[in-house]
Design a protein with these regions (language model features):
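Alpha-helical membrane insertion/targeting regions
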Residues: 1-161
């Protein structure tokens, strides 16, 4: 595994800060919203994290992490646009919740793969993207994502947002 570059460190630190703010926002407000300051900071940091991911090419060129970065950028932009314009009417809250919650998934999949292929430094837990431990983490994250999304949709429906 190549060493982490300066942009890689910046990307990692911003990404960790983003995730921490995202969890805080989720547990405080039940869903992310551009109208809540912690959520807004999360979304800006997520956008920066995703854009910096597009500049990291030390692992063999354009890959799945870059696709996740593009999806995260699109999710943030679409979610903010729909939340601010309410263009989808009553479905707007569901749509921006889908977009913003999806950014957690787009963070976690490449982060888990990269972390498991780097740590511990002397003997990483995984050798490749297709290592079973990475696949298990990815399956767990997808399950958590769908449970969280269903919970949020039920909460939105019950609150008539």
């Amino acid at each position: 595994m190549p060493e982490i570059t300066l942009i890689g460190w910046f990307h990692t630190v911003i990404g960790i800060a983003s995730i921490l703010l995202g969890f805080y926002s989720f547990f405080s407000f039940k869903l992310l919203s551009w109208n809540k300051i912690p959520s807004r900071i999360y979304l800006v940091l997520t956008f920066i994290t995703a854009v910096t991911a597009l500049a990291i090419y030390n692992q063999g060129g354009f890959g799945i992490a870059h696709i996740m970065g593009i999806l995260a950028v699109l999710a943030v932009l679409c979610g903010v646009c729909v939340e601010r314009t309410r263009i989808l009417g009553y479905l707007s809250t569901y749509f921006y919740t889908l977009c913003f919650t999806s950014t957690f998934l787009f963070h976690s999949l490449p982060a888990a793969a990269d972390t498991l292929r780097r740590l511990p430094v002397d003997d990483p837990l995984a050798d490749s993207l297709f290592d079973p431990i990475i696949l298990y983490f990815h399956i767990a994250f997808v399950i958590i994502y769908f449970i969280t999304l269903i919970y949020q949709f039920i909460w939105i429906k019950n609150k008539n947002l």
